[in-house]
Every structure is written in structure tokens, then in C-alpha cells.
Swiss-Prot record:
It comes from the Eukaryota. cAMP-dependent phosphorylation on both N-terminal Thr-29 and C-terminal Ser-203 regulates AANAT activity by promoting interaction with 14-3-3 proteins. Pineal melatonin synthesis is severely compromised in most inbred strains of mice. In C57BL/6, a polymorphism activates a cryptic splice site causing the production of an alternative form containing a premature stop codon. The predicted resulting protein would lack the putative catalytic and acetyl-CoA binding domains and therefore would be inactive. GO terms for biological process: cellular response to cAMP; circadian rhythm; melatonin biosynthetic process; N-terminal protein amino acid acetylation; photoperiodism; response to calcium ion; response to copper ion; response to corticosterone. This is Serotonin N-acetyltransferase. Pfam families: Acetyltransf_1. Its main location: cytoplasm. Induction: Exhibits night/day variations with a drastically increased expression at night in the pineal gland. The modification Phosphothreonine is found at T29. The record marks H118, H120 as: Important for the catalytic mechanism. The modification Phosphoserine is found at S203. Highly expressed in pineal gland at night. Expression in the retina has not been confirmed. Extrapineal expression could be strain-specific. The keyword Magnesium does not apply.
Length: 205
């Protein structure tokens, strides 16, 4: 009778090139381009993109890794990621807010009863910038928010130089934001999702 304890594990030897073929085959089974809500498992990839995009410019990040995990656990439906062959290349993370204007608390809180989606961060991987991906993702995200009956508007804060970019999507400046980060100051912008639906119908997107 064969004693299984005497069996020794042996390495599996594949023909030359087989492993490369299998890896390629696995990649080819992934969708070339996919949009989906993020999960806590996507947090590390999102933070790496965000850190590279923001630290070099402003010295800080809108969200740090534990905060990303926090929001993707509480409200993953308020996020959207763009994946190319399974790799995250751009994303937006949001949460619900229940006051008219943003406050320091809004940076870390999710208010389930709120009607306002607070966009914490939009970031694009460095190799995919200057290709219009941020614009496409933001259109899709606003459309995604519009499909959620509880969400009536979107709000964000940005530096003055980015205000014209967001105005193209129906956002309107409502004045200086009460939030400051170090020496950085921001403009607060709001967008009615009803207004966005009109713009989208007339944009050809």
C-alpha cells in the first residue's frame, strides 16, 4: 500500500513559453475597458494613483489610504473606477453630505441621509493623463449619480485654476470654500444633477 506521507512534492514542468502564454491568455480575458464602482480591495491602487497625482503638486492628498478604505466600505456606490485590462487607470470617490455647504467635517464623514454627493477626489494615472479620461469619467460619474434617486446634487472643492474645467460639466462656483489645507484655499462648486442631465443630452456623450 502506498504511504502518502512518503510522497514528495515535485515541481510542475511546463513546456517552454507556456507560462507566458497562460499569462497573456488571462490578460486577454479581461475587458479592454470597464467602468465599475470601487471596492475596498481597490483602495491601494487608488491611493498610489492619487499620491503620485497630488503629492508632487500640493504636498498632500485629498484622501489617504485609510480614508479611501473607509469610504469604499461605507458607500462604494458613490465611487467609480475606469479599468483598462483589469488595471485601475482613473477613479472618483464620493460620499453623501447633508448640509448646504462643505465644512471640515465633510472631508471624513459620510451622511447616509444626505442628498448631496461630495466628490472627494478625481485622479488619473500619470500614463493616461492628457487623453480626456478625466472628462469622460466625470460625465459617467455624474450620470451614475443621476440614477440614484436620493442624490439631488453634486458638490466639490478645487483650486481656482480648475474651476473652468468643472464648469464645463454644469458645476457653478458658490464662493470660497470654508475648508483650507495648510496654505491652500479652494473654491466650492455645486452641480444640480437635473442640470447635468440636460447638458449630457445636448453634449453627444
Amino acid at each position: 500500500m502506498l504511504n502518502i506521507n512518503s510522497l514528495k512534492p515535485e515541481a510542475l514542468h511546463l513546456p517552454l513559453g507556456t507560462s507566458e502564454f497562460l499569462g497573456c491568455q488571462r490578460r486577454h480575458t479581461l475587458p479592454a475597458s470597464e467602468f465599475r464602482c470601487l471596492t475596498p480591495e481597490d483602495a491601494t491602487s487608488a491611493f498610489e494613483i492619487e499620491r503620485e497625482a497630488f503629492i508632487s503638486v500640493s504636498g498632500t492628498c485629498p484622501l489617504y489610504l485609510d480614508e479611501i478604505r473607509h469610504f469604499l466600505t461605507l458607500c462604494p456606490e458613490l465611487s467609480l473606477g475606469w479599468f483598462e485590462e483589469g488595471c485601475l487607470v482613473a477613479f472618483i470617490i464620493g460620499s453623501l453630505w447633508d448640509k448646504e455647504r462643505l465644512t471640515q467635517e465633510s472631508l471624513t464623514l459620510h451622511r447616509p441621509g444626505g442628498r448631496t454627493a461630495h466628490l472627494h477626489v478625481l485622479a488619473v494615472h500619470r500614463t493616461f493623463r492628457q487623453q480626456g479620461k478625466g472628462s469622460v469619467l466625470l460625465w459617467r460619474y455624474l450620470h451614475h449619480l443621476g440614477s440614484q434617486p436620493a442624490v439631488r446634487r453634486a458638490v466639490l472643492m478645487c483650486e481656482d485654476a480648475l474651476v473652468p474645467f468643472y464648469e464645463k460639466f454644469g458645476f457653478q462656483a458658490v464662493g470660497p470654500c470654508a475648508i483650507t489645507v495648510g496654505s491652500l484655499t479652494f473654491t466650492e462648486l455645486q452641480c444640480s444633477l437635473r442640470c447635468h442631465a440636460f447638458l449630457r443630452r445636448n453634449s453627444g456623450c
